Amino acid sequence: MLNNLRNCFCAFLLLFIYVLLPQQSFAQKVDSTKDVTAKHPKAAKIVKNILYGLSFLHYTDRKKDRILDGAEDFEQFRGKKLNAIHYRSLKPYGVSIENPDSPVTKKAAKFANGIHISTKPKVIRNEILLRVGDTIDPQVMSDMERNIWDKNIFKDQKITLETLPDDTNRVNMNIVTQDLMSWNIVDIIGIKSAAIGIELKNFLGLSQHWNNYISLNYRKDKLWSFHGGYEYRNIASSQVSLNLDYNYDPFVKGLEFYVGRKFYSSQTKWAGYLFANLYKQSAKENNFLASAVPTNVLFNAQALWFPRAYSLPFIKVRKDPNMTYKFIISAKFNRLQYLARPYTRTADNSQSFVNGHSFLVGVGFARWDYFAEQNVNELVATEFFTKGFNSSFLCGLANEEEVGNRYYTAFVGTYAYKIPNFGYFALRGKWGTYIKNEKAQNQVLNTSLLFYSNIINFGKKIFFRQFVRANFNQGWNFAANQDLFLNDQNGGVRGIFLNLLRGERTFSVSIEPNFYAKFKVVGFSGSVFAFADIAMAGSGEGKYFNKLIQGYGLGLRVRNLGLGIDYFDLTFAYYPNLNEAKQKNWNVLVNFSNSRKIGNYAGTLYDSKTMIFQNAPIDDADI
């Protein structure tokens, strides 16, 4: 089965690379928002219909790739008074934001609109951050636009401001949204499984989701699974959200609960969350093409976080009036307990099941300032990137069963800047240490760099971005069974999931050129990329680094919201001169995501030693 899957993936990669190469049939001017159908639109339509039929997704409603431009869109209206707010909600089918009054002629569309439960107007009213008479703030407008889109109950939206013809100092706000279908019976053939389930959006006309799925998995040791979740966002206009996820399969059984409020705008004063989970994990699946790693643990975790933000209006920069500076104080409690486990730690330290808890307080200086970009970490979809300087100081008490109580303190700083006509870079540094019996333990310095270039056009059909990522970590005063390590999940060579690189210091760099298509092929957006990953580790006073691993390869990323593919990544990696008994010198990696699962809000918050300005654009500032 796995060999057949690999052959299919490789064939698909070669086919899609061929499709993305500039072809003579694509000589006309290309619109990146439309499918290129070449000289045979009927044949292309047949292919598209076959794809939709094979995917069993022709009854499923999907979001559109609406491009959000951020605060820049509203800059021309800065300082003007809001005169009125007009809101209109559209049915899911037969109309669009651009043509809201088009007659619905198809019987299927009329039937679907008839059984759809429309979103109640108060859902949008609860998201509007300005009131009539307020002054337009472009940053607040951008925050509101992003918040509405992130609710994931609309397939499309558009927010515009219009100056009154008789008073140029006053504007009207127009908000148009188009609902996603409020319910779907969903069939999906995915990379890891085939699933069927029911998906409820706009449940009871409110911003609620309730999803349940049964999956047939493509592996004998995990033949079937069941998962689902419930979510209610912005309860009673409080911006507090509740989330419950549950999962049952041969590897992982359990549930998790989250209730919290994020920093949802530049004017937010407080946030926080409560998180708890309970899981029984029999094995860990690093890559679905590889064998699962046995774990056999039962654990529960809790996290409680509460920050308070104070505005610093006296700090202003003329070049960027949208930025807002904050002084933040916060407190966080983490706890992780294993109720059953085979051992505390493996000999190679690749797996550890150590009980612990911590309480930390922090103060920080943060900047609420971000911009919108497309085609960076995801295809087409709008992403947000921070700008400016953030810093924080943390201190508190940590307890781990192997070492007992220790004090912990850390300094964190980040700086990000968008260089005009060149690109974007973000630097992050953190120094932290434990203290016990007046002696420092497990001191670690972490530094990281992210850079991506501006778009460089190659003709009318292809554009290019260059990515560079680098990490350097240095540790001191480690216990005998503890050290730093690098793998796929913490900045090492992609596809190397084992802790083959361990030591007092580690370094890694990744260089990745990406080539994107400006057109779509039967609904697919795509890019191809190459990469070179180099990682090394060292200990002692001899060679600074005494072990090196290299990885080189090619990959493909595609996106097709109509087929339910939010993100598909196929990567082939080769590791020259790698002589490891437990690791092949090549790997095939597949990542696939869609909007099926409501999502794990807190993820691995319970093992974090820092407090994040959670869910805010300042996502890398530990506060």
What is the role of each PLM region?
Residues 7, 22, 27:
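Beta-rich carbohydrate-recognition modules and glycan-binding surfaces
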Residues 2, 26-440, 451-623:
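Immediate N-terminus of the mature polypeptide
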